[in-house]
Amino acid sequence: MAKSPSRSPRKRVRKQVADGMAHIHASFNNTIITITDRQGNALSWATSGGSGFRGSRKSTPFAAQVAAERAGVAAQDYGVKNLEVFVKGPGPGRESAIRALNSVGYKITNITDVTPIPHNGCRPPKKRRV
């Protein structure tokens, strides 16, 4: 039985992106950070829950900071240097995620709040009685 000629394993070439966008979705229960290129194609992402935090600890600013650091380090493999930040939601991880991206070494060029505001749309949830 003849062996087929073995192919040498080709190293996957990652595209180099200088400018990127960071989308931070900060809800009351979790924080999701996605780093994309200019066209919106995802390069890396991380969540508070995926970073090892469970339950009520997912919604802390520290959990958002750890998630932002993980997403930022993963996106550095693509050569991202500058980030434009889009923040959505009222959660506690908004500011700490931006600070964490800054501490990883990105130059933040712009911060935009894209939280959706209803024009008297859906009825909000009832107030909690504790």
UniProtKB/Swiss-Prot annotation:
User: What processes does the entry annotate via GO biological process terms?
Assistant: translation
UniProt keyword Ribosomal protein present: yes
State if Transmembrane is listed as a keyword.
no
Entry keywords, A to Z: Ribonucleoprotein, Ribosomal protein, RNA-binding, rRNA-binding
Alphabetical GO CC annotations of the entry are: ribonucleoprotein complex; ribosome
Superkingdom field: Bacteria
What molecular function does GO assign, one term? Answer: structural constituent of ribosome
Q: What is the role of this chain?
A: Located on the platform of the 30S subunit, it bridges several disparate RNA helices of the 16S rRNA. Forms part of the Shine-Dalgarno cleft in the 70S ribosome.
Q: How does it assemble?
A: Part of the 30S ribosomal subunit. Interacts with proteins S7 and S18. Binds to IF-3.
The family annotation for this protein states:
Belongs to the universal ribosomal protein uS11 family.
Q: PANTHER family annotated for this entry? A: 40S RIBOSOMAL PROTEIN S14/30S RIBOSOMAL PROTEIN S11
Q: What is this protein called?
A: Small ribosomal subunit protein uS11
In its UniProt entry, the species of origin is given as Shewanella woodyi (strain ATCC 51908 / MS32)
UniProt lists the gene as rpsK
